[in-house]
Amino acid sequence: DENTCSMSHLGIALAGQVNAVSNLNAYVASGMFPGTHIHPITNGVHHETWTSPALANLFDEHLSGWRSDPTTLAHAGRLPDEPLEMARKDARAVLRDLVRAATGVELEEHRLTIGFARRFATYKRANLVFSDLERLRALGAGKIQFVFAGKAHPKDEGGKQLIRDIFEGASQVEQDIPVAFLEDYSMDTGLAMTSGVDIWLNNPIRPMEASGTSGMKAAMNGVPNCSI
């Protein structure tokens, strides 16, 4: 169409080098733009920014130099168990306090807390856990709780519907499974969540997730990813 312009093709034509944010992203993009050499440079996160104060203090004590050389964190398996658990406990308490103040939801200290905070794009499937409420209750009643956060683009109706789905699902299971949604997402909220949950939920439609960095932030705080 002579009246339209593809910004992707224009950018590729004018660029000296075309990069992707992961190996998978480069593979998928190469299929979308045949004949274009696409160089993968995997995304990352700034390690100091996304480490909770409690964990940072522990790293300072046992992993000297981690701030200037993050490869030092490869030795995190040597951290003593009890101080590590205390640091994780502090981070969990920060998140519980934030959720209580912002939403009124009382997270329970001894439940497994599952977190999900991202841009609400449809391919990220933020509402997937509510697709089978009976199964969710059977597996999680009295055992788990959820914290969600994020924003949808104002013109993304699908993304906004995901948020409505989460609120609807939360209302259906709230007697058995607490669900909190932290509004006005910010970096402070992101740090509290990625350091204060027990499991980080990741369930995008493959291969539409180009890289995904929130799980890297969680990993900085000893939080494992559950990828579906």
Question: What residue ranges belong to the model's regions?
Answer:
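Catalytic cores of carbohydrate-active enzymes across secretory and cytosolic contexts
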Residues: 1-228
